[in-house]
Amino acid sequence: MKEDKLTQLQDEIGYHFQNLSLLNNALTHSSYANERHWKYERNNERLEFLGDAVLELVSSDYIFSNHKDMVEGKMTKLRASLVCEMSLASSAREIKLGEYLKLGHGEWVTGGGKRDSILSDAFEAVIGAIYLDGGLNPAREFILQYVLSDIEKKQLFYDSKTILQEIIQSKFHEKTNLSYALEKEEGPDHNKIGRAHV
């Protein structure tokens, strides 16, 4: 990716990399790397793995420190709501991450840069890249700004999902897996209202 595009993204996220190849890898989907017969180190899957762990640590620490009267089960539910695919994809859209992704031709033509799963994975990869480049503190700052800043909205979304899931399971008396896709989001950044398709 051209350096000016990488600079633009770094300005957007408020972190400038010492090692730009980390950011480049975080933006490289496996479909893009596979088309070029690149080794697995040059796509974002390993960085996503690391970023997921950093995200879990930082969000757990945040919840533990800021919700002192919350019991373990509620802390677990809150963390799950903050780091779920839809929440991370929303955070990725906030920084326009889809515009910077390197996708294989098939993913690109089918709108992969807008897909929640690809966006959330890339977002975690960026967290992993920031962690490797600058350590835990800059990764924490990034997570605080883009994931944990809107905690009430994300908790409400998870609670709505949980209620729906419990209703479905009570009607069918079995575990039913539902998937959710964000269809529309409107309103100011600090108070967005979303509509999801189940």
Residue ranges and their predicted role:
Residues M1-H197:
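Double-stranded RNA-binding/processing signature
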